[in-house]
Amino acid sequence: MVSSSSYDVSAALKQEGLKSSDWDEICRRLGREPNRAELGMFGVMWSEHCCYRNSRPLLSGFPTEGPRILVGPGENAGVVDLGDGHRLAFKIESHNHPSAVEPFQGAATGVGGILRDIFTMGARPIALLNALRFGPLDDSANVGLMEGVVAGIAHYGNCVGVPTVGGEVAFDPSYSGNPLVNAMALGLMETKDIVKSGAIGVGNPVVYVGSTTGRDGMGGASFASAELSADSLDDRPAVQVGDPFLEKGLIEACLEAFDSGDVVAAQDMGAAGLTCSCSEMAAKGGLGVELDLDRVPARESGMTAYEFLLSESQERMLFVVKAGREEPLMKRFRRWGLQAAVVGQVLEEPIVRVLHHGEVAAEVPATALADDTPIEKHALLSEPPVDLQEHWQWTEAQLPDLADPAAALLGLLDDPTIASKRWVHRQYDQQVLANTVVSSGAADAAVIRLRPQQGDGSLKTTTRGVAATVDCPNRWVALDPERGAMAAVAEAARNLSCVGSEPLAITDNLNFPSPETPKGFWQLAMACRGISEACKAFQTPVTGGNVSLYNETRRDDGSLQPIHPTPVIGMVGVVDDITKVTGLGWCQPGDVVVLLGVKPDADQDDRVGLAGSSYQQFTLGTITGRPPRIDFDLEKRVQGLVRQAIADGLIASAHDSSDGGLAVALAECSIASGFGVELTLSVGTMSPARLLFAEGGARVVVSVKADQLTRWQTMLTSNPDVSTTVLGTVASHGRFQLSFGVGSTIDLSVDQLQQVYADALPRRLA
């Protein structure tokens, strides 16, 4: 018989983030009232963070299959086939709410958690990336959040020995008090078989390995599924504390154990801890799990069943092991200084049964926790919200005339979202493992050499690599979620193409406000539609990801400040020859600068524009209008040509035009290289602001090698559908000279551009 407990139901439901209707459904499924431990289990497993109760119907529309997809959504991480026997596991997840109240540990444990998702599949982590959002840095609170988050990411990644090779950082008032911390990890499969999480074999022992269990991280999943308020600092106990050195040992021990063949299923203990790992293993396997809490290694005395089940102590794993092989396996982990204990067994009956002090502390059907969970039904607006329809009436004619183009360019280079992120990147070890080909700031995507271990532990020599990037134009998404989400996928694919990589698949992190408002759910639904359409167009299936809702801060007056909807796209691709990878900087004076994509003087082309642009924000202090239309066919033609030109050795550099438009993209190429340029743009009837700073248009700036111009022209002849515009040449002098119109020129020293670009963040953080 399950032990009972007396408690205040209303208070308990509020604490667990459950509704009265949830209580009724829980009682119906159990055939009785739940005790306090069981209610806690339902609270975490029925939270948005764990069961996607608001977003699951929308996610079902994503394309998830393809010739390269080995593992799609539903496992700890997606896995793609890179060819030549290489398999890549990758995933992105958020740690937003914990980072808001405890930025260092919140960000650090976000890194630890995503690494566990990777090596739980049997993959050795080879790289980390992150996507970060903060409020303006003129607020000391936002400065403190940024400093803590970056330090936490650096601490965990550097100590565990995995390079942080790329990412993006952006700033907007909507993120004040609610930063976004999305961590992505990549891993190279080292096991013959991919390790799955579904329980196998009735009677097989369930083995706990890793760190001890304490009271840290209590209720973290429920905490992550509610909005932030002035009282959120009181939720610091819901933030976990990580130990990267212990995780390093856990990585090595797990990979050894998986290679032995003794482990038949594995699940890391992340959100909802033991509750989630037990219920998911049972539900996926169609079996049950019995868990004896008296056997769980504990770091604190007197812990209740509720505390054991909801603890989110870090660096812990749960295995199902072949019967009779548990002792050799546990010895392996103890050699690495890790805890290891048999804590239960696989049951034929599909339940999660929890024992504590010789009594049944909880007994719940596994599918009720991890599979057959509630789905919230929201009505979808039949048309865009009124405020967005009003925004879409804005035209570029309402912008003031551009009086000083050079000052505008310098102002945009001083924008923290555009400016150099060296202050961030220099805190990360980007070269540990010695496989980083290009990393943050040097190219549009990170590239990592593929050097898998042989059976004897030696490294296989290869010139192949994998490229990765994270992207999201959050201003565009705020104004048009569907177009903005399409643009996120398109930009990610463009960034990979700019290093010569063929895009393969994505992982997504959907950071959104509350879905309980009509506008909030519409934003989420439209963004999902945009991602789906774009992924189908680029043939980049979704392998999994994360949904983080209720990203909004309650002001002192009780109103809510929602973030910009921010669907971050993590994309991976294969690089056939890392010796041909291109960076964004010019390489040689005399090389010809060419723009691919929509021509600079395309005045009425709705594929480029200033609505939602960095220039609009810089000029007006706000954003309005409707972002440019995404042309998938043009994107694919441009990207295919760039990849072909890189493979054939025709171009020396490639850089996509995104934040700040064409002038900023060109300036960034000079900043990265130190070389000047002599460029001329045809104006036509366009305004100078649109000519220089319009965004969109599937644009990529390349520098064609001077000695390859004939071959370049031959390639263009065979690709007549790709629009190209010769802009000028790379110069040996150190000046950025950009002429447009009659007598209009931006003429600045590259040194000045570099100084403004480099000082923007340090000056604000000083």
Swiss-Prot record:
Its main location: cytoplasm. Keywords: ATP-binding, Cytoplasm, Ligase, Magnesium, Metal-binding, Nucleotide-binding, Purine biosynthesis. Pathway: Purine metabolism; IMP biosynthesis via de novo pathway; 5-amino-1-(5-phospho-D-ribosyl)imidazole from N(2)-formyl-N(1)-(5-phospho-D-ribosyl)glycinamide: step 1/2. Its EC number is 6.3.5.3. Substrate binds at S94, H95, N96, H97, R116, Q240, E312, S313, Q314, S548. It catalyses: N(2)-formyl-N(1)-(5-phospho-beta-D-ribosyl)glycinamide + L-glutamine + ATP + H2O = 2-formamido-N(1)-(5-O-phospho-beta-D-ribosyl)acetamidine + L-glutamate + ADP + phosphate + H(+). It is found in: Cytoplasm. Transmembrane segments: none annotated. GO terms for biological process: 'de novo' IMP biosynthetic process. GO terms for molecular function: ATP binding; magnesium ion binding; phosphoribosylformylglycinamidine synthase activity. One of its GO terms (cellular component) is cytoplasm. InterPro entries: PRibForGlyAmidine_synth_PurL (IPR010074), PurL_linker (IPR041609), PurM-like_C_dom (IPR010918), PurM-like_C_sf (IPR036676), PurM-like_N (IPR016188), PurM-like_N_sf (IPR036921). The active site is at H49, H95. Mg(2+) 2 binds at D117, D268. Monomer. Part of the FGAM synthase complex composed of 1 PurL, 1 PurQ and 2 PurS subunits. Belongs to the FGAMS family. This is Phosphoribosylformylglycinamidine synthase subunit PurL. It comes from Synechococcus sp. (strain CC9902). The lineage of its organism: Bacteria, Bacillati, Cyanobacteriota, Cyanophyceae, Synechococcales.
